[in-house]
Amino acid sequence: MKPLLAIAILILPAPMLFAQAGPRVSTLPFESVPSPLKYSIDQNLGEVLSVAVNSRGHIIVLNHPGTATAGPVYGNATTQIFEFDADGKYVRELGRGVYGLAYAHSVRFDKYDNLWVVDKAAMSVIKFDPAGYVLMNLGRRDEGPDEPHYRKADPPPTPVDGLFNGSTDVAWDKDDNIYVGDGYFNSRIAKFDKHGNWIKQWGGPGTGGVHANENPGHIRNPHNIGIDRDSNVYVADRGNRRIQVFDVDGNFKKFIFLNVPYDKMRHPVFGNLPVDRPDETAPWTICITNTTPQYLFTTDAEPGRLYKLQLPEGKILGTWGESGHELGELNWAHGIACPSEDLLYIADMNNWRVQKLVTKGKK
């Protein structure tokens, strides 16, 4: 099927109608602030996978340094969690020596300023209080296996209630129930109550077809998740190049596609120029603002853009950026924090930095 203007729209039964975007989208008026974080020379960042901001404006940076201890890097301690104040001044490091930290994938603050860290390799979700003490752990880290269990078996192992396999992200609904993106290999959403008790799961591995519009509810890596005030659960179904929207019980509501035209002949940062590049690109991140109305920000790896969507419709309002290495360019934007629609922090993974974006004229 050929796209209509900027966004592909398919006529489906009412619960499956696609969010629509206009025929053209504008460039978002963001500018990137040089050197937004202040730290010493011995704290150079490595791959930055995620960033979060609490109610005080303090910034948490999830860093993967080059100081892993003996053993396979992926299965050992290669995670640092740095805190900076609202002015970007270094405050402290959190989580040193915590058993469930190995190769952390995402950090999020809940509405109580508790910090949650989702670890892909340790297959754990860890809750820290504002002081930095561990309050809860979901999942369980393997006991130093000889063979790395994070590798996908063929066929993949059967998911187990309460355990994860390549966990990616966490979100909460208005009743404080916990939703975990699980993950690289289980490809499901796991739901717990606020005490950490298992409730249910939904999803499971499956493809979206050539145009990413088939098999609703099937997921290929729920890479990021978020929940709005209307209890819509947004899942960045990265492997299927789509955002899936569910209610809090896991009932599918609609797809949203990042189907804004781009230069398909522009060479990607990594790899050869693909022969058949799809119209829709793969969402990597999700951040929903605590504003009225709410907005959803997301990114893709190629062509390396940031997208702003209006909720709950999912209409794309604009894009910003492109892939590259310079300030204002992105090289695998792996996480977003969105304190407001005019202030964003982006975990610019392969550029080894955090970019701070502000709307021009609103510094």
Question: Where are the model-predicted features located?
Answer:
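Positively charged n-region of N-terminal signal peptides that target proteins for export
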Residues: 1-4
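Bacterial N-terminal signal peptides
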Residues: 6-16
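Eukaryotic scaffold repeat domains enriched in small/polar residues
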Residues: 20-363
